[in-house]
A protein has these predicted regions:
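RNase H-like two-metal-ion nuclease catalytic core shared by retroviral integrases
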Residues: 93-94, 101, 115-136, 147
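C-terminal anion-handling pockets and recognition modules
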Residues: 5-9, 127-179
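RNase H-like polynucleotidyl transferase catalytic core
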Residues: 34-42, 110-126, 143
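Extended, low-complexity cationic-aromatic segments
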Residues: 1-78, 171-174
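Short aromatic-enriched loop/helix-cap "lid" or pocket-rim segments at secondary-structure transitions
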Residues: 21-25, 102-104, 127-129
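Short, hinge-like loop/turn segments at secondary-structure boundaries
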Residues: 27-30, 108, 132-135
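Generic structural signal for small/hydrophobic residues in well-ordered secondary structure
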Residues: 13, 51-52, 77, 93, ...
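RNase H-like DDE/DDD metal-dependent nuclease/strand-transfer catalytic core used by mobile genetic elements
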Residues: 70-117
């Protein structure tokens, strides 16, 4: 009897990354100084980080200046596509660039199986928890500036997924896809 190949789910999303993780507002008990507080008022620079993850691996992490628009989404899909197999299914949220005409046109010519999450359901997207974990790690290390952040990006993402990927996916109610 022929067995169908097992489907492997990937979850994709983007997040904003700032080059200054130091808080600009803080509280302390009356009479005590605030520790680790940056009194300078600077405008942190923003970049967008986009990637896909499975329970075991991170796919096509990419960081760029500005926000995600259809052209950037298309570039990312072009980077991601060579890493995909026919049994992969990419799950995305409903951000506007994910549904753009350019993206739909590309997908018509270069089939990638995509499912969209229901509206307003970030709790169903494991990569949201990966983004929270990476940002927490960078804050704890007090890394500042994009060169320092990006130098550790690939290793940090892979390390978090290798250590906690299955738990992250299961925490989003996808435990049945892990077996």
């Amino acid at each position: 009897m022929l067995q169908e190949p097992k489907v492997e789910f990937l979850w994709g999303d983007e997040t904003a990354v700032y080059d200054d993780w130091i808080r600009h507002m803080a509280r302390a008990p009356v009479g005590l100084p605030v520790e680790n507080f940056n009194h300078q008022r600077t405008q942190p620079r923003k970049q967008t980080l986009i990637a896909a993850m499975s329970a075991e691996k991170v796919f096509a992490p990419w960081c760029f200046e500005g926000s995600l628009e259809s052209d950037k989404m298309l570039q990312w899909l072009q980077q991601l596509r060579p890493q995909l197999h026919e049994n992969h299914v990419l799950i995305l949220d409903n951000a506007r660039p994910h549904h753009a005409c350019k993206v739909r046109g590309y997908l018509a010519d270069h089939p990638i199986r995509i499912l969209f999450l229901p509206p307003y359901s970030p709790h169903m997207n494991p990569i949201e928890k990966l983004w929270a974990a990476i940002k927490q790690r960078w804050r704890q290390r007090r890394l500042r500036g994009f060169p320092r952040l990006l130098a550790t990006l690939q290793a940090d993402l892979q390390q978090i997924v290798e250590k906690s990927g299955k738990a992250i996916v299961a925490s989003c109610s996808y435990s049945s896809v892990l077996s």
